[in-house]
A protein has these predicted regions:
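ATP-binding N-terminal substructure of ATP-dependent carboxylate-amine bond-forming enzymes
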Residues: 1-112, 118, 128, 146-153
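Short beta-strand segments
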Residues: 25-26, 164, 201
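A short, flexible beta-alpha/helix-coil linker loop
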Residues: 28-32, 167-170, 243
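A conserved helix-loop-beta module that forms one wall/lid of the active-site cleft
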Residues: 102-175
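Amphipathic alpha-helical segments that line or abut small-molecule/effector binding pockets
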Residues: 151, 256-263, 317-328
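Phosphate-binding site of ATP-dependent enzymes
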Residues: 180-260, 281-288
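Flexible, glycine/charged-enriched surface loops at secondary-structure junctions
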Residues: 200, 272-276
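C-terminal active-site "lid" helix and adjoining low-complexity regulatory extension at the edge
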Residues: 281-332
């Protein structure tokens, strides 16, 4: 059933390959000093190449300012075909960092292949989406440190805790605290570095599972859950940056429940395009929401790529065609 639904989206692309435009907008980590969520150069080049192969009218910008200027000065034809953007660019460092380009583009009837500006901001804010998702699944006990008025005495000393910046991704600033006596200092240090709220979250022992979700006009499609294979207690910034982990397809009856829950969360958040819901699966097969990726990585070393490869072996275009097809579905 999943393959049939994805193939329908791919067929939209194959039938209309000359009748739409795609603009990929990136901004490297030096563009405005972003702390996380940027693409490495080799990832950007891979995505650029593969998007260009599934659109006959294709543009790439590695500077969001140049894109904005070209639109304002009418240097891109927006009238002949529907135009889509796939933007990984970030403007600024606050919660709206990913929203500027989609919001600006909507003024010119350019359609986003990801969620809209509001949803991107919502899914940037971990503490808020935990509150919205807790009616669908378990959430680890979570406190939010905003300033020095926080009462550390309420933290249970018998547990291990994870600290993480509220607005960052890619494990930026994530740290496992085993000694409760170090917690306060580590939180204050993180707050000073990242200049944002810091989450203090109960550490759940278990396997990390990622569930890619593709949202089209008429369907929320949960792909096969992917297991993160690692020899570490958790994915830290260093492990992610050096890719010291791999992916494999999760097996077992729990998969259907994970997929259903991931679909419910994305529907509740009104997400669009490709998203990813990350869980921790404990020894009793209880699953806990760990993270939400509004713009998950789609290069070769990613759970999204592995999920599509499982459904469409040896077909590198499948993932990219499905993303564009989901965008086209809203115009049919």
């Amino acid at each position: 059933m999943i393959k049939k639904e994805l193939q329908f989206l791919r067929n939209l692309v194959k039938k209309q390959v000359n009748e739409y435009s795609v603009i990929f907008i990136n901004g490297d980590k030096d563009y405005n000093g972003v702390l996380s969520g940027y693409l490495e150069e080799y990832e950007q080049k891979e995505i650029d190449q593969k998007l260009s192969l599934v659109s006959n009218n294709y543009y790439f910008y590695n500077n969001p300012s140049t894109f904005v200027g070209d639109i304002i000065l009418n240097r891109i034809d927006l009238n002949t075909y529907p135009t889509f953007i796939y933007s990984t660019a970030q403007i600024g460092l606050d919660i709206n960092r990913r929203s500027f380009i989609p919001n600006f583009s909507s003024l010119y009837n350019i359609h986003s292949l990801s969620s809209g500006g509001y949803q991107l901001s919502l899914m940037q804010n971990k503490y808020h989406y935990y509150q919205l998702a807790k009616k669908f699944c378990r959430i680890p006990k979570t406190y939010i440190y905003r300033d020095s008025s926080f009462d550390f005495s309420k933290i249970e000393q018998s547990k291990k805790w994870i600290i993480k910046p509220n607005l960052e991704c890619s494990a930026r600033g994530v740290k496992l605290i085993k000694d409760i006596n170090e917690l306060k200092n580590e939180v204050i240090v993180a707050s000073n570095i990242y200049r944002q709220d810091i989450l203090i979250q109960e550490y759940i022992v278990g396997r990390e599972i990622e569930v890619p979700i593709l949202i089209s006009k008429n369907k929320v499609i949960a792909l096969p859950p992917i297991k993160v294979n690692k020899n570490f207690e958790y994915l830290s910034q260093e492990i992610i940056d050096t890719e010291k982990y791999s992916f494999s397809i999760l097996q077992g009856k729990i998969c259907a429940n994970l997929q259903k829950t991931a679909e419910e969360i994305c529907t509740n958040l009104e997400a669009r395009g490709l998203c990813r819901i990350d869980f921790i699966l404990d020894s009793e097969e209880n699953f806990w929401l760990f993270d939400i990726a509004a713009l998950p990585l789609i290069s070769t070393h990613s759970s999204c790529y592995v999920a599509f490869r499982d459904i469409f072996p040896n077909d590198d275009s499948a993932l990219y065609e499905a993303i564009i097809g989901a965008g086209l579905s809203w115009l049919v």
